[in-house]
Amino acid sequence: MNIYEKHVLPRILHCACGSKPITRQREKVVPKVSGVTLEIGVGTGLNIPFYKNSNVGKLIGLDPYSENWKIASQVKEENDVAMEFMQADGEEIPIPHGSVDTVLVTYTMCTIPNIAKAINEFKRVLKKDGKLIFCEHGVAPDKNIKKWQDRLNPIWKKCMGGCNLNRNIPELISDGGFVFDKLDQMYIPSTPKFAGYNYWGIAKVK
């Protein structure tokens, strides 16, 4: 990890992913968690304020970068939310099989290198009746927008810490062995369309 990725990028992402339209998206999904909850890619803690309105039990925040947790821990204290930090990758979650009620992932599936492996891990750690709650940006349905996503993706990925603009989120979740209880999608307002097509909902293991 270079200096940019270690010290600069986390704060850029904290600002970008904390915009009002994205914050409204977070507010839609985070309160739906319940029981033992594992947040994948807790990052700088942008979801933390919304746990107060949920039925969360034990809360675990997983992230590969301890630098993010330095920011997230401040947010945690400000909101009086108890969260255990776990430094690990989404592709290899150090949690036993069938041990969590909810897996929450927001604006993170775009970045995980081996996303198929990570989704298998989500499925592995969930209890039999557990749920995957997600809110992600991804491939747009409009051909012209998708073309721009494909063109911009290489440089975007390099500058934004591995973020991909053009992943098909519903397809990835479905192919990973989940079925949707709820799936919504739209361009979020006040956001460039190439980065602003959102998918969010709830899925359960097939």
Where are the language model's segments positioned?
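Conserved alpha-helix/loop element of class I SAM-dependent methyltransferases that forms part
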Residues: A16-V36, L46-F50
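Class I SAM-dependent methyltransferase SAM/SAH-binding core
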Residues: L38-E92
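A short acidic, Gly/Pro-enriched loop at the edge of an enzyme's catalytic core
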Residues: A88-V103
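A short SAM/SAH-binding and catalytic strip from SAM-dependent methyltransferases
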Residues: D101-I115
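A short glycine-rich, Lys/Arg-flanked "PGG" loop and its adjoining helix->strand segment in the class I
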Residues: A116-K128
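Conserved beta-strand signature within the Rossmann-like core of class I S-adenosyl-L-methionine
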Residues: D129-H137
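Short alpha-helix
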Residues: G161-G177
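Core SAM-dependent methyltransferase catalytic element
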Residues: F178, Q185-K206
